[in-house]
């Protein structure tokens, strides 16, 4: 925990909470009038706190030093569920089935394509940070604690990363790589098979429209009415509207201009 000047406390690590906890409160959620539950990413994240970057402070933003992947946005395997979330007899597929069949609640899954884990500036390289694994647990990519400009275009372990930074020390996934696109899109299809009813897309504006068009086309070829909405943090409605065009994937967006007005 991190303490503020007036005794406030902010937690930057795991505090429990799992599928069973949500399911145990499904009736309460349903009685409040909700029809769906949106979970932050459920993918496997590194277990340790990140030792690099700028140390996180109370009330600070865009700082990752000392933080863990409790939030789920630092995936190192897009097919593997994080061990903190399931329990015996309650996989993600079983969770979505029970939410739907017993409570009439749909499941919205948060997905990421822009980045993986924090990947460089660690004093000593840490397990799972900067790494990406396939469905069988084989290492596909490794940032090797190198700054983006030091990545080697001739090293196959660096193929999945752009050679320039984007957000803090997060690995900047290279959506122009066909193998990476296949890896990501197939992972999204896998989670739909496990019961996801819709996707909330993180940092959608950081990835070119062409990727989202390809992803949308492949998903809707199998699931024509599958709903997706993106987090494009911008207050310009004309900019946000570009995501919704069919040529750009026809993906809905969160209404940040309305949020600003409120």
Where are these regions (language model features)?
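Extracellular/periplasmic catalytic domains that process cell-envelope and extracellular macromolecules
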Residues: 30-33, 98-102, 106, 122, ...
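N-terminal structural segment of carbohydrate-active enzymes
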Residues: 1-106
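Short, solvent-exposed turn/loop segments enriched in Gly/Ser/Thr/Pro and often Arg
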Residues: 38-47, 111-120, 203-208, 231-235
